[in-house]
Amino acid sequence: MDAYIEFRNVVKKFDDFVALDHVSLQIPKGAFVTLLGPSGCGKTTLMRQLAGFSEPEEGDVLVDGKRMNGLPPFKRNTPLVFQEYALFPHMTVYENISYGLKLKKAPKEEKDRKVAEMLEMFNLQGLDGRFPKQLSGGQQQRVAFARALVMGQEILLLDEPLSNLDAKLRVEVRTELRQIQQKFGITTMYVTHDQDEALSMSDIIAVMRKGRIEQVGTPWEIYFRPANRFVADFVGTVN
């Protein structure tokens, strides 16, 4: 397996607490990889090392063979979508989606074209003039996805992005997201504690506990061939 994203012996500490304990993980280009585990196991902390919001004390983070350590987030091209969406409340849907293009000083024609593509991709046509407070939770989440991808990024980081949606809408949005990810070959890292979500969406699952990776494998391998009792118990709670 050729690694497009790679974590090499990454260590992250908060005072005396070891959040990541020599974590290594390889992610191939175009894969949908889920970090799965209970709260506090290090999932989001590992993702933040890739996004650039945190730096490891030891180890390396690489994308396409290039070391990311020390680079600020805006130079990494690794957009992160949070569960709170983080939309600008005073901006319309169009302005939220096109914000990165505005910072890049893209011409209006390019902004209009790319925003139109995102509106169609995420079924948001006709909502470009609305403000976030005028949207449903599912629509707000789609706007957050569109804003993250409008610059043509090849990597997408998702930190429990569906946890604020009701069960039916969560299934609907995750199906859309997976279809878009597969269509465009976006290398995606997804954080969740929801076993069903991980098993239904992922190419690869990395099960984490106490700052370490317990097992990496396909959903089938994780479910039917767990590496240890923890993985079996944690994943086996799916109905």
Give the role of each language-model region.
Residues 76-79, 83-230:
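ABC ATPase nucleotide-binding domains
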Residues 36-38:
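The feature captures the beta-strand-to-loop junction immediately N-terminal to the Walker
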Residues 51:
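Helix-to-loop junction immediately C-terminal to a conserved catalytic motif
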Residues 44-47, 143:
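ABC ATPase nucleotide-binding domain helices that frame the ATP-binding cleft
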Residues 54-55, 62, 102:
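A position-specific signal in ABC ATPase nucleotide-binding domains
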Residues 59-67:
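Conserved ABC transporter NBD signature motif
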